[in-house]
């Protein structure tokens, strides 16, 4: 009897294997998308944190630590400031007639000549820096009646006393200093920059010893401007053994204009002019070393790549640079929404589609197919839908860079102490611009991320609809991104569905017949396999009970004899 019961139960299990889902006359085809075990969190318009399969960092947060010498021409100021090089400080003679794209001033730079001040220092520095050259042309000024080329022990060239090489210190000759009236026309086709100065003696005695008169006067004029300076005689803090000073001024003479110099003393005269050019050159204060490398973007911290649309290394930049923002990180989604693959698929090892989760390990594409048929299981990527999504996403980063990279941004804005209010206003404007750009950057990236996720979801839906239209009534949508195909569909058949050559008419009759042969109601729950197994197990148990009851009834009636041997 035990043998009979066991055989009955085994028979039930054998019949159980003939489930519709595992019948050779049907197949399952699922559509899915790429997934990774650990995705990247990005921000969208509707969600602060959403996980995607891949994302690109948009904020450059570090520099190379050195200033690249290419493609920009970098001039290292070393121990010289730009103004000292302009005036011709003896220890800056090596900078005469030099050219640059970016002049790098060092914190160790110092002056080593007659102590001076420049009332409009920032403007002169900016003007010369943007010109990009120290090209100097000597001119023959007629300084009749005075001695030229004054010198000072505070300004030594080698071991002998000297003076600024681009300036001519005029002083008395034979205790005479006549009034000077000199003109110099600009017959060229470019602007000329003249540097001149006024000497402020420390005592009245020094004044008369050098210029005879108790008080001098200097007036420099053009058709467009006039400057008059009266020396201020008096002692000042001692610098390099001197308590007197020189004030440096500058005048631009346009083509066709005339430079007119009138003086009755204290004039530090020009020896010629500097050519003024219009260009993209500039100046930067930095102690970063200059290295042999190539980078379009330079900051005081060093060069940085410009392959990202934003940077937070330094707000001061030169060249084609990413836009400065306050954020440390902004991530652009370059992949689809990530739904990690579940580890279990039920008792039958069933496959699942994109509605349930993504597929890990699909390296050949973002979208693809998995199938289960009489020949086994398989997987293949759909390259067309993958490429359609990639083509639209790849251009995002380049478009962001084009929108945000600044070409030769004004890197430094300086003002004298007198212009403190203007400086405060400028700082406020710059800070406001940075705040706005930081907000715009975050909003722009969130919009792009939202579009990327919507785009990749749309491509998945397009592929699903394309497949559904091919299969028509030959298959049933299982509701999880899969189709149950009601006809025998080998690997060649599956391949025709993937490449769009499937002919549903060929399989239509077979699919309809198989639909009618399937008994019962197919459950749509995720626990379908479990319920089917439990149902068959209960059925087999009841069958065994009925069979056992029949045997016992037959034994009672004498129709069956049961011998028990011990």
UniProtKB/Swiss-Prot annotation:
Q: How does it assemble?
A: Homotrimer of disulfide-linked HA1-HA2.
- Which cellular component, as a GO term, is one annotated location? host cell plasma membrane
Q: Where is this site: Cleavage?
A: 345-346
Q: What's the gene?
A: HA
Please identify the protein, giving its name as recorded: Hemagglutinin
Specify the signal sequence span. 1-16
**Residues linked to a lipid group, S-palmitoyl cysteine type:** 555, 562, 565
Q: How is it modified after translation?
A: Palmitoylated. In natural infection, inactive HA is matured into HA1 and HA2 outside the cell by one or more trypsin-like, arginine-specific endoprotease secreted by the bronchial epithelial cells. One identified protease that may be involved in this process is secreted in lungs by club cells.
- Organism equals Influenza A virus (strain A/Beijing/353/1989 H3N2)
| Residues with attached carbohydrate | 24, 38, 54, 79, 142, 181, 262, 301, 499
